[in-house]
Design a protein with these regions (language model features):
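A short glycine-rich beta-alpha junction/loop motif
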Residues: 91-98, 130-151
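Short, structured motif recognition centered on aromatic/hydrophobic residues
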Residues: 7, 12, 32, 65, ...
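Sequence-specific dsDNA recognition surfaces
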Residues: 13-24, 38-67
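A short beta-sheet element
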Residues: 36, 61-117
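Non-catalytic DNA-recognition/assembly elements of restriction-modification systems
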Residues: 1-22, 179-185, 190
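Hydrophobic stripe of amphipathic alpha-helices that form coiled-coil interfaces
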Residues: 168, 172-175, 179, 183-193, ...
Length: 201
């Protein structure tokens, strides 16, 4: 059982650094997948089809993704949507995405991913968004979001539990919408319970 005194609240700006993506024209073929905001679905997953590509030139090598890199859409209807990159192929992230880098001795990427799907993240993000008709959640706004950070072993336990529910939700056939909805509600319930750490006075 995690003791509340072991949970620290930090702003994302205190524990992370954020990098905007590479600006280029997407192509139908190339040496790396070009991941755009339209490639992240409503559940924070990478859409497997409709891929676009670019050729990896020297100036875009620093935008190549590694496994467990986190990406967030910063503009448009999908602002705030966060995905975790878990593919084995080369990929570069586009300009309307922000890459989030956290010290892995403080924050496990998958723990953050689950947090970014939840109510606590969205309550804050929706207050920080700007831009009216074209919503923007830029890096400066993102830095202000507060996150509860339990010790790493507790983060690992939370991730293990939530991953099981997430896997169940996404492994069910598309032909069972009622079952999918029930699983999604179950995942959302446990996510909110497991991430509900009262703030220190």
């Amino acid at each position: 059982q995690c003791r509340l005194k072991d949970v620290v609240w930090k702003t994302l700006g205190e524990v992370g650094k954020f990098t905007y993506g590479y600006i280029a024209k997407a192509q139908d073929a190339g040496t790396a997948r070009f991941i755009r905001i339209s490639d992240i679905n409503a559940n924070g997953k990478l859409i497997p089809n409709g891929e676009k590509y670019i050729d990896v030139l020297p100036e875009c090598k620093k935008y190549l993704l590694k496994k467990n890199d986190l990406l967030m859409a910063r503009t448009g209807a999908t602002y705030g949507k966060t995905m975790i990159f878990s593919e084995d192929y080369p990929a570069v992230y586009a300009g309307f995405l922000i890459k989030l880098d956290f010290d892995k001795n403080i924050l496990i990427p998958k723990y953050y991913w689950h947090f970014a799907q939840g109510e606590l993240f969205w309550r804050q993000a929706n207050k920080l968004v700007s831009g009216g008709g074209q919503p923007q959640l830029n890096a400066n706004a993102l830095k202000m979001i507060k996150i509860p950070i339990p010790p790493l072993p507790e983060q690992e336990k939370i991730v293990a539990i939530l991953d099981k529910f997430d896997t169940l939700t996404n492994s069910i056939s598309e032909g069972l919408p009622h079952e999918i909805a029930l699983r999604r509600k179950q995942y959302e319930y446990y996510r909110e319970q497991l991430l509900a750490f009262p703030k220190a006075a």
